[in-house]
From Swiss-Prot:
Disulfide bridge map: 39-89, 55-75, 60-84, 64-86
Gene source species: Arabidopsis thaliana (Mouse-ear cress)
Localization: Secreted
Signal sequence region: 1-30
GO CC terms: extracellular region
Protein name: Putative defensin-like protein 190
Amino acid sequence: MKMAKAAATNDFGFITCLVIFLVLAGISNGMRMTQKVSCIEGRTLWARPPKFFYCSSTLCEDNCINTGAYRGGTCDMEDEVAICRCHRCKKII
């Protein structure tokens, strides 16, 4: 009986460590800077149907800033499609 209890405890510890590792790995990947893109004023970063995605200018602006080439972005609805366009290019020295 003690062996079964010990095995269950080891499985629980392993699963706990695995979950912690996956969470920390996901957080560190989320903080990593994305690949820089060349700056084209008004570039469309993404276009998604509103059935799956609502137009969020805050999310769009964050996505544009994370590319490293823009200072802002706006989300607009065109023909029932949410379109994120990036604006205000950064000067790359």
